[in-house]
């Protein structure tokens, strides 16, 4: 069956968007608020109608992720910030595979996310309460699967409990996107052998944004 590179690229951009948010938070203590909202909301919407629906139904919502994806796919410089983004992206993919193979982990994750939906009746998506709850899910369900993702940035910034919670919530969103990526036919070999196809698709989607 032919692979749907549109959906694969959208999901991959979702992973990259989370990686970029983590990087922004770790270095600056703040991030693109609109992109963060899209990524966090993707965790909570458990019944989207389409791959694009996971990210709010608009390609523009993934602009940051698409731009990051192009940077990761075409990085001639494997050092510094580009290397960080590549490492975060690949680490999220590895953790998703561990989540998929760990007995009961996906069910536990689903139950905990259902709890988030109930909290949304009382709190805003980007409230400290929701951020802390998402961070706790990452710590309790994802982190024990290993290997842990080493987040690098400003030590002073990373000492902030609020930044830590946003970083972990963003990583949880990255796991959500990685699950979606596999569901629509994504695989790590594509990063090596279908790089040109993914690059062309990402550029085509960005042209609409």
From Swiss-Prot:
Superkingdom as given in the UniProt entry: Bacteria
Cytoplasm keyword on record: yes
Coiled coil: 79-121
Its membrane topology: Peripheral membrane protein
Keywords from the UniProt entry: Cell inner membrane, Cell membrane, Coiled coil, Cytoplasm, Membrane
Subcellular location: Cytoplasm; Cell inner membrane
Segments passing through the bilayer: none
Gene3D superfamilies: HflD-like
One Gene Ontology CC term in the entry: plasma membrane
The keyword Disulfide bond belongs to this UniProt entry's keyword annotation: no
InterPro entries in the record: HflD (IPR007451), HflD-like_sf (IPR035932)
NCBIfam families with a match to the protein in the record: PRK00218.1-1 (NF001245), PRK00218.1-2 (NF001246), PRK00218.1-4 (NF001248), PRK00218.1-5 (NF001249)
Similarity section: Belongs to the HflD family.
HAMAP family referenced in this protein's UniProt entry, alphabetically: HflD_protein
Protein name: High frequency lysogenization protein HflD homolog
Upper classification of the organism: Bacteria, Pseudomonadati, Pseudomonadota, Gammaproteobacteria, Enterobacterales
């Amino acid at each position: 069956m032919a692979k749907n590179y549109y959906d694969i690229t959208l999901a991959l951009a979702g992973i990259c968007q989370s990686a970029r948010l983590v990087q922004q938070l770790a270095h600056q203590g703040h991030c693109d608020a609109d992109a963060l909202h899209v990524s966090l909301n993707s965790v909570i919407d458990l019944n989207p109608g389409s791959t694009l629906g996971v990210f709010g139904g608009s390609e523009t919502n993934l602009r940051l992720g698409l731009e990051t994806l192009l940077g990761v796919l075409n990085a001639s410089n494997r050092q510094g910030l580009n290397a960080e983004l590549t490492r975060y992206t690949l680490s999220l993919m590895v953790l998703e595979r561990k989540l998929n193979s760990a007995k009961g982990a996906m069910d536990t994750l689903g139950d905990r996310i259902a709890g988030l939906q109930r909290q949304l009746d009382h709190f805003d998506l980007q409230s400290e309460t929701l951020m802390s709850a998402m961070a706790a899910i990452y710590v309790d369900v994802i982190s024990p699967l290993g290997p842990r993702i080493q987040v690098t940035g400003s030590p002073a910034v990373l000492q902030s409990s609020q930044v830590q919670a946003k970083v972990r919530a963003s990583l949880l969103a990255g796991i959500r996107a990685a699950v979606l990526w596999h569901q629509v036919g994504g695989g790590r070999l594509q990063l090596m052998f279908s790089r040109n196809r993914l690059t062309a698709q990402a550029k085509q989607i960005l042209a609409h944004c």
